[in-house]
Amino acid sequence: MIKADFYTKNQIAKLGNALIFLCEKMQAVNEPVSKTHLLKLVFIIEEISVKKYGIPFFDLRFDVWKLGPVSKDLFYELSEEPTLLSDYIIREVTNGNIYIKPKKSFSDDEFNDNEIALLEQISERFLYCTAGELINHTHKKDSPWYNTAYKHGVLDLLESGAKTTTDIEIKLCESIENDKEKLALYRSHKDFLAQSKTLKS
């Protein structure tokens, strides 16, 4: 489960409502929403947000796992009965597979116009993708997952299945390291969030 002392209320509300948004979009076309679907879509949203605006969408940490970039906190939250996200989603298990449904309607209170547009863009682009297709998308050559795994010497181990998880963080800021303006925005945003968490504690 997600650690309650590590995320602000606004972060939890933003993540919860983003999951609701994705669930509503997929359910509208009768697509089941699996845990793997959401884990991959959350990463894709974060990746594109950093590349496009220089600002993390959720400010989650993602690690290199065999099945793709994974936020361990979100993985465990969706694998068990939700705690911090219990106001937003319902977890159901069917034939051993975990599916997520919205607990209430989407609220856009935590999002600006660019963020809503990004959610729309991602949901439309990947609406009919299977979990396997999303994994392949996040594993493609020169992706943050691929580059991080290669850099740390675990790419072959992960692809062969000899290793399934790691504690190696995917640093999305590396994708904008040549864009000084976006990198400055990224660092400023991270500093702001760190200060917010300090004040909370």
Where are these regions (language model features)?
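Domain-edge interaction signal
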Residues: 1-201
